[in-house]
From Swiss-Prot:
One of its GO terms (biological process) is terpenoid biosynthetic process. This is 4-hydroxy-3-methylbut-2-enyl diphosphate reductase. The keyword Oxidoreductase applies. Dimethylallyl diphosphate binds at residues 96, 186, 318-320, 380. (2E)-4-hydroxy-3-methylbut-2-enyl diphosphate binds at residues 96, 186, 251, 318-320, 380. It comes from Cyanothece sp. (strain PCC 7425 / ATCC 29141). Keywords: 4Fe-4S, Iron, Iron-sulfur, Isoprene biosynthesis, Metal-binding, Oxidoreductase. It is an enzyme of class 1 (oxidoreductase). Catalyzes the conversion of 1-hydroxy-2-methyl-2-(E)-butenyl 4-diphosphate (HMBPP) into a mixture of isopentenyl diphosphate (IPP) and dimethylallyl diphosphate (DMAPP). Acts in the terminal step of the DOXP/MEP pathway for isoprenoid precursor biosynthesis.
Length: 405
């Protein structure tokens, strides 16, 4: 499929929307009421440090809702305002935050059902319905299906994600295989790969090293295909399709690792084909999201403070939140990833998600005496959720009445 031509055609359709409908003032007030917090604003104005009783909070300099997330949520709210009686669907979670997605459900925005095989069932969508595409985007195939049905489409895809798609289009135009640094099952990576002619998804530097070793030294083709069996394009052949490669990434991956992977492939292809031929075999574009980078940079600064523990707040399926937790764990700071204040209590206990493990309960997680707690949150986490977590921590450590944010 000529994905570029399809996008041009879709974007010119009267049924397709990627801007608001004129309800900005009303929606802004709704979002302020539901997601902002005066306590968090107070802490920001105090240099991101705040003390109450025995608890000192050190907030990351950058955390929480990014511009792309705010835009997506606002467009979803505007869509409901503009189509008050129409049936509205969304192809996936608008963002990876349970409270925001629950609010959409309460606004009668329905999620496309998924069958036992994990496939979305679009048969429930009628031509007169409205369909929201989430911040992560949607695959070309999904957009084509919805367009063929004649649905009204509200596209809230983050512009940074669209930037990655444009890079992948350039790979395709130059007959380069797209090496995508990401998680093959993540909605954004699924959408990105749908724009590529040939692609291979690598999760981390270790997988990238395996691929680069294969490029230089060859190897067991069947072993390669089995190892990446969920992560490459149809008919992918490692002996044929790794001669010319371009680098792209899921925008929420660790910036440093994406850069390492890009440099590794560049060095590998330079060794194989020579410095004078590198432009014929390697293509790289900077597709790292500014907001992801800012939050990661802020986390690296935060872990330099003398902290007793770290609380990382965000959806458990949020890639950017997980990477923030990784930074804390690398510094050997006790770290607790929670998705809401409901995970704290009763008493001095917390239900949290350790890295790459299921939820578990930790008793007596807050130490006795004065403590300094580092706080950050993923790009899909509202300030109100962070504020609720802080109030729970203050309540556990102090008998003073909780401040109402």
């Amino acid at each position: 499929m000529d994905t570029k031509a399809f996008k041009r055609s879709l974007h010119s359709s009267n049924q397709y929307h990627r801007k608001g409908f004129g309800h900005e003032a009303e929606v802004t007030e709704m979002l302020r009421f539901e997601y902002q917090s005066s306590l968090i604003q107070q802490i920001r104005e105090n240099g991101n440090r705040f003390q109450r009783g025995e608890v000192t909070i050190q907030l990351a300099e950058a955390f929480g809702f990014c511009w792309g997330v705010e835009r997506a949520v606002a467009l979803a709210y505007e869509t409901r305002q503009h189509f008050p009686t129409e049936r509205i669907w969304i192809t996936n979670e608008i963002i990876h935050n349970p409270s925001v997605n629950q609010n959409l459900r309460e606004m009668q925005v329905e999620f496309i059902p998924v069958d036992e095989q994990g496939q979305k069932d679009f048969s429930v969508v009628a031509g007169e319905d409205v369909v929201i595409l989430p911040a992560f985007g949607a695959s070309v195939q999904e957009m084509q299906l919805l367009n063929d049905k004649g649905c009204k489409i509200m596209d809230t895809t983050c512009p940074w994600v669209s930037k990655v798609w444009n890079s992948v289009e350039k790979h395709k135009k130059g007959s380069y295989t797209s090496i995508i640094h990401g998680k093959y099952q993540h909605e954004e990576t699924i959408a990105t790969s749908s724009y590529a002619a040939t692609y291979l998804i690598v999760l981390d530097l270790k997988e990238a090293e395996y691929v680069c070793n294969y490029i230089l030294n060859g190897g067991d083709r069947e072993e390669f295909l089995h190892k990446f069996r969920h992560a490459y394009s149809p008919d992918f052949d490692p002996d044929r399709d790794l001669v010319r490669v371009g680098i792209a990434n899921q925008t929420t991956m660790l910036k440093g690792e994406t850069e390492q992977i890009g440099k590794l492939f560049e060095r590998t292809l330079m060794r194989k084909y020579g410095p004078d031929q590198i432009n014929q075999h390697f293509l790289s574009f900077n597709t790292i999201c500014d907001a992801t980078q800012e939050r990661q940079d802020a986390m690296f600064k935060l872990v330099e403070y003398p902290l007793d523990l770290m609380v990382v707040i965000g959806g458990f399926n949020s890639s950017n939140t997980t990477h923030l937790q990784e930074i804390s764990i690398e510094r050997e700071i006790p770290s607790y990833h929670i998705d809401s204040a409901d995970r704290i209590g009763p008493g001095n206990r917390v239900e949290h998600k350790p890295l790459h493990r299921p939820l578990e309960i930790k008793e007596n997680w807050l130490p006795e005496g004065p403590i300094v707690v580092g706080i950050t949150s993923g790009a899909s986490t509202p300030d109100k959720v962070v504020s609720d977590v802080l109030e729970k921590i203050f309540a556990l450590k102090s008998t003073s009445p909780a401040l109402i944010p």
